[in-house]
């Protein structure tokens, strides 16, 4: 099935942002974007990705979309939008349905962090995955590439979660959407908009 969505030809009809793939495999978002290019599948990079907008753009040939959350810090949002423009992103996907973070019980139970903390349980787990460890040691991308440099101290999921809970703006309105649209000036897709 082929279709066109905001001027992008694609062979599938659904599209979702990719983030944290860099925790599963070194440079995971870059690899996902390259695979998407190879197979003609659209790619959208998440704000909360391990690889930055610039990292993905430097390792791909086709434009990709960038997914954005509305946060209270408008200077940060404006800077992200400018970075997406500079990287040649062809559309901005504005997420509307994540203004209040849910509890990810498995992540809390497993004490998931990025990069992994060196606990005895994690050391045993990593010892059984030498290929993953070698890949992670070889890459420079181990943190949230789109957040680092703005939010000091955001180096694992629990600090990112606290920062996000403080930054995600539950008072999201159509005025905010208009502000993002004016900042972006390009193709804008609203994600998470439903009729009730």
Say what each PLM segment does.
Residues 38-59, 63-77:
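A gly/proline- and charged-residue-enriched helix-loop-helix capping module
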């Amino acid at each position: 099935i082929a279709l066109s969505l905001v001027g992008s030809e694609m062979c599938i009809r659904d599209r979702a942002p990719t983030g944290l793939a860099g925790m599963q495999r070194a440079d995971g978002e870059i690899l996902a974007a390259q695979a998407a290019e190879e197979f003609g599948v659209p790619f959208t990079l998440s704000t909360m990705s391990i690889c930055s907008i610039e990292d993905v753009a430097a390792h791909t040939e086709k434009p990709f979309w960038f997914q954005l959350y509305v946060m209270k810090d408008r200077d940060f949002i404006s800077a992200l939008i400018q970075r997406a423009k500079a990287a040649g992103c062809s559309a901005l996907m504005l997420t509307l349905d994540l203004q209040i973070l849910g509890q990810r019980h498995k992540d809390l139970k497993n004490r998931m962090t990025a990069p992994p903390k060196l606990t005895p349980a994690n050391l045993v787990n990593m010892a059984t995955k030498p290929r993953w460890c070698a890949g992670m040691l070889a890459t420079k991308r181990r943190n949230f590439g789109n957040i680092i440099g703005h939010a000091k101290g955001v180096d694992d999921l629990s600090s990112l979660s606290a920062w996000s809970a403080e930054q995600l703006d539950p008072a999201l309105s159509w005025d905010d959407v208009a502000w993002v649209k004016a900042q972006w000036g390009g193709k804008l897709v609203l994600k998470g908009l439903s009729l009730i």
